[in-house]
Amino acid sequence: MMRHCRREWLLALCLISVQLLIPTGCEGVLVAASNMSPPALTPLLINQVDQLVEHAWVKCGLDKRTLEDVRRHFNYNHVLAILRRMSGQDIKDTSPDIDGGTSVLSLERRDAILNCLSKQNFMSIAGQDGLKILSADYIKALIASLRTDLAQESSTTKSIPEQAGKPVPGKTSTPKPVNKPTDSVSSPPDRSYKSAPTEKENPPTKSVAEKKKDSSGMPNAFIGLSIAGIALMAHLCLCCFMCHGTSSSDLRDDKPLLTLNPSNLSAASKSSQGNPIDVNKLGVVSLKSEAGQNGDVKLISKEGTNNVNVVHPVSSVSESTLMPPPEGANNVNMVHPEGANNMNVVHPEGANNVNMVHPEGANNVNVNMVHPVGSLSESTPMQPPVMPPPIPKLLSPPAPQAPMPPLKASPVPPPEPSPPPAPKAAPPPPPPKSTGPGPPRPPPPAMPGSSKTRPPPPLKPGAKVGAVENSNEAKTKLKPFFWDKVTANPARSMVWDHLKSGSFQFNEQLMENLFGYNSTDKSSDTKKDLSSKDATQLIRILDPKKAQNLAISLRALGVSPQEVCSAVKEGSELPSDLIQTLIRWSPSNDEELRLRLYSGELFQLGPAEQFLRVIIDIPYIFQRLDALLFMANLPEEASNVKQSFATLEVACQELRNSRLFMKLLEAVLKTGNRMNVGTFRGGAQAFRLDTLLKLSDVKGTDGKTTLLHFVVQEIIRSEGVRAERAAKEQNSGVSSVKTDDLGDKSEQTEDGYKQLGLKVISSLGDELQDVRKAAILDADQLTMSVASLGHKLMKTNEFLNMDMKSLDEDSGFHRKLTHFVQQSQTDITFLLEEEKKMRLLVKDTVDYFHGSAGKDEGLRLFVIVRDFLAMLDKVCKEVKEASKVAPVKAKAKQPSQSLQSFRDPRVNLFPAIQHLRADSSSSSSDDES
């Protein structure tokens, strides 16, 4: 651990020194490059430069007519002065004299030609030495100097008179261009003027300073190169020391960092050989398998993967390109079995100790060792690729070789040195010996994130690729059988380990016939057409929603169009659901016309269109279906209407003839008149029956007993006395028994009367049972039902007498429809008469209780009575429960007092109606008579 830390510190110090020293060396090199001596301006060079300037001038799109003006006003003295400063030599001015050469060139034209020269690509000639390449910094310095000198000249010319001197030809000169494109280095004139030094105003002083400055260029270059070389050598020595230290330290670790072998991928590997590595879960290794258009396979592994065995199966016969692992991936064992042809293997930097074993059939293998920039010195030429020697034939895959210890990947890759010899490490356990060819290796598992399927497993020796494909294609595809697979556990014995492979054999042909997708039954043409419709484009005639709903309903009912056609022609009974479905989703007139005109194949239509196309050939098919539906539904509908009429008739009779209901109405009327004494509501002779629903709203002084409770208790008492008298009459034969005589008997108590009266009043709901049924009915609905039956009968009769008569058809449907119309006319006529009769009966019943109401209330009377009966049953239950819970009172000492309290139980609750108690006996007597 300390050694690794020391290496990292040494590497960090080396990198810091290189970062500090390389800029100084580079600066010296740049100074030396900028001080390259330009050639002397000879007449030949001036002419060549003039031609190049003219060519550049035209190429830049400038006006050629102004070229002569530029030649007259542009002085070559500027170029000569710059060349003297740059080279430190005394260059003679051999250019001819031109009058007016000292004139000042305009600012726009001067900037235009300088910008143009800085953007051109042309070769410069340097005397007899031929072509010579100048650096971009040299051209930048030359053009910047031209801009500065011209700016100073223009400012000096305006202030100082023109001096006498030998003019120079006005041809435009160019700096020595390079053989590759240079960036535009011309800067704006204002920036050039600001950056010009003040020493340039004095030419003699400036020349001396430039010579002193240029004289130190070469020493700076030598110093920079020396420092860079020393740093580079130190870096190389440090890398060699690190490689040697890593190799020596790894001798003590015989276990490889990572090993991917075919044995690791099998689930039956033993624990002694290491746990199998799941490649999908490795965070370090990520192999990408990408298949191109031609089936090329690229396997890419990330940095840091070592000892990787890449096995190419036999089926990879197309050209494959193996993308190598990046730097740091060492000890790559690539085994190419037979059939792996045209393999291009590229090894980048850091991939050392590559052991490639090519068995028979591995032909045309191109191994390209690509070294990145910086790994070799500039003087080292690229070596041509070396073809590998022929590989002997192998009967079985070779044993994996000893893995090399991994090398640490440094951030700055050093030049590729010759690797030291690999140390001898303990090899992994050898594979089991086999006399014959071993089993095929399993293919590498599919990597996560890869959508491509992995290649099939390799074949056995001697087998052909086409044999597997033919065998797979020959097998018929069967229906899937969904189950949950269980992974075999090699650590323990399972029941599946005891199953023998040859103990059970099944009939392959029978399985294909039973569970195959492709049906071999050719007798049913309709099923074959329906099964093949998915492969073709179906023709849609109906509305999509209508077609879908009709197809779903027909599939659920399971009726064929031929059965429908036969039933319609013979007049047989069809399911009502089927007829309603066909009528509901019947096609429109336009859709029906298109179905009739369709003359193509039926299998080209959808399921709904096929069904309708078959049955639509029958004339008036939907009118026939409507008639069949009416024939099927009429008996049931007529029976329901007749039963409703009977219920109403019985309910009216029960309500008019119920004695107990009449007694209840009498009690309510007398109680209401007594409570309304002295008001305009008193003295009533009758009341509407909906008043019965208001009895529970009036409560007594105790806050619990309502007026309905009071009325029920009174009726319970009176009905109890009456029941007792009726029982005695039957036993003794006496025609009349007074109530006072009953009260004199001490054995008769109040509880006995309550029990008898409570049974009588509780039976009122059972007595008016048909009234409750009549309350459920709807008079308007009954009227509409009868009217609908009559309308359907008229429509069917019209269809029979007009449409069917025009066809002159003598079929079973025609005969049955004629008989049905004749019979149904009598039934529907009877229903129409009964409906009128029932309406009159209900109206008479309502008038019997309410008088001449004036408006038709329908069956509301029965609804009111039904609700009142529900309230009455509830009160009777409360009274019955109260009688059980209440304590039994002790009998009074005087029989007269007990009789008096029995005779007047209502005085305590409602004293105002005490005088009415005297009439109770007479009322009971009247009822008895």
Swiss-Prot record:
GO molecular function: actin filament binding
TM region positions: 222-242
Signal peptide (from-to): 1-28
SUPFAM superfamilies according to UniProt: Formin homology 2 domain (FH2 domain)
SMART domains for the chain: FH2
Polar residues bias (residue ranges): 171-189
Membrane topology, from the record: Single-pass membrane protein
Biological processes, Gene Ontology terms: actin cytoskeleton organization; actin nucleation
Subcellular location: Membrane
One annotated Gene Ontology cellular component of this protein: membrane
One Pfam family linked to the record: FH2
Primary location recorded for the protein, binned into one broad class: membrane
Stretches assigned to the FH2 domain: 468-898
Listed Basic and acidic residues bias regions: 191-215, 738-749
Membership in a protein family: Belongs to the formin-like family. Class-I subfamily.
Protein name: Formin-like protein 11
Record organism: Oryza sativa subsp. japonica (Rice)
Gene from which the chain derives: FH11
